[in-house]
Amino acid sequence: MWGGEMNIFKQKEREFALNRIPVLKEKFPESNQILNFLSHILEYHNSIISEISDLSISLDNQNIESRLGKGKPALKLSEYDFEPFLKYFYPLLNIVYEHGTPQMKERVEHLQSLEKKEILSLISSFLENGISDDMLRFFLISYLQPILYTFADKVKFEHERWFKNYCPVCGSKPSVSFIMDTEDWEGARFLRCSVCLTDWLYVRTKCVNCGNVEDDSLDYFISSELDYIEIQTCKKCNSYIKIIDLRKDGLAVPDLEDIASVSLDLWAQEQGFIKVERNFMGY
């Protein structure tokens, strides 16, 4: 099975993502403010995906196959020139300034004052080394996600050869996982990239952070009110990740469910666990 075959599912998922927001607001009333803000970001993402999907994006398939064969992510994004896509950064700033928090608005004003080469440098640095500034991380991933989503659409990989805990496309960590039935697998577990939203196959009973497979140190918690969301914790490395069961709720959108269920993150963190990777909203 090639990675590209999942994109029909993902494209439909992106189309229905906005329609999922009202449902999530009912399920998670405590997250309404977050979800209202998220709806504006999703509208921005969908418009960018729609526009960029019409462009001719060429990738070096030979280099991609070589990198994947060596266990490296298909794309070394820090080497890519994002200047042609920089025009999409400024609409994001306008959206955040209009709908974001006072702290976000202050950061928008700072980012608007930077020269283009400074913004490109921030993007390159983030893709090469990551970033510790939570607010800046939000802006950069919010901007990059729809662009890299279209890049990932061009990358093919064999799921059976990539049971790793980092993205086969961009190398980022997953922020959420989910279970679904496919033509090839029943009850298969997938990880979803925190940056480019690529999905890839992973062992169901294995810690995503450290690779632990010992049953006595892996626990699973399910809320009686949210039985389609499970939290997998690992006592060896004190990490956790959510598992969204699409067999119980076929309309669930894993990355959105993860953001909306921030109350579950707070519970897991109170128990002393650290998330494998935060979503782009920082939760």
From Swiss-Prot:
GO terms for cellular component: cytosol. The keyword Amino-acid biosynthesis does not apply. It is found in: Cytoplasm. SUPFAM superfamilies: FdhE-like. GO terms for biological process: protein maturation. One of its GO terms (molecular function) is ferric iron binding. Keywords: Cytoplasm. The keyword Cytoplasm applies. HAMAP family: FdeH (MF_00611). Necessary for formate dehydrogenase activity. Belongs to the FdhE family. This is Protein FdhE homolog. It comes from Aquifex aeolicus (strain VF5).
